[in-house]
Amino acid sequence: MPLVSVDLRDRVAIVTGGGRGIGRAIALAYAGAGADVVISAARNLGEAEEVAALGDALPGSVHAVAADVTNDRDVDRLVARALERRGRIDVLVNNAARGMRFVNERFMTDPQPFWEADPEAWRLVIETNIVGVFLMSRAVIPRMLAAGRGSIVNVTVNQSTMVRRGFSPYGPSKAALEAMTQVWAAELDGTGVHINLLLPGGATATGMIQDDMPEGVELLDPEIVVPGALYLANAESSGERIIATAWNEP
């Protein structure tokens, strides 16, 4: 694992979906590096508040906000809370997502064809994984442009997951996220605002995984993304796609 020493003192970061899994790991890592971190939770504020309490022992801080990234007013409120810290936003991690469990609880063992999916569950995944990222990025980028700097980290998945049988709409939503990231990187070129992709590199122990996983499946620890997330907080380029399992190799 590469040694990533990052000083995030005086920085303000938003990590969506920061109450558990990958978001939790990134939020605590940023606070450990000195950042003021604001995390969102759409469904379980208690989890996010527990993460915030852990931040009390770190050089930085963690603040929990109940917010759904698909709701414009929630997004505005989340951004306003972050701006209360130091009047700016330096880093946005678009981590909040809805996985296949919202469409099919047993998606790993009993794949469901797309035509059998519930339309409302389908919409919820698309709204969170694509529209939510758009709303959050749209809300913070003007502030970053005014400051002449900023970093956006979009959390994605393996490309094989994007086209895997039974993984619709989750897989395709992440393919759309990656396409959006490349387009936005081009549009932000030369502004000082950078946008990149980060993924664990395999199935990860988060709330998105079904409870009875197939025998022999080993889950990655969410902490695996921490070195990459720290690196991207100070990114000076755009369009990178960091795969944690490969990037962490010595």
Task: List where the protein language model places each region.
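Catalytic Tyr-X3-Lys loop
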Residues: 98, 111-134, 153, 177
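The beta1-alpha1 cofactor-binding region of Rossmann-like NAD(H)/NADP(H)-dependent oxidoreductases
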Residues: 45, 66-78, 119
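Alpha-helical segment proximal to the catalytic Tyr-Lys
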Residues: 142, 185-187
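Conserved glycine-rich cofactor-binding loop
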Residues: 19-20
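Active-site helix of classical SDR
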Residues: 137, 173
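Conserved mid-core segment of classical short-chain dehydrogenase/reductases
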Residues: 76, 99-123, 146, 166-169
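C-terminal helical subdomain
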Residues: 190, 197-199, 214-250
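Conserved glycine-rich Rossmann-like NAD(P)H-binding loop of the short-chain dehydrogenase/reductase
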Residues: 33-50
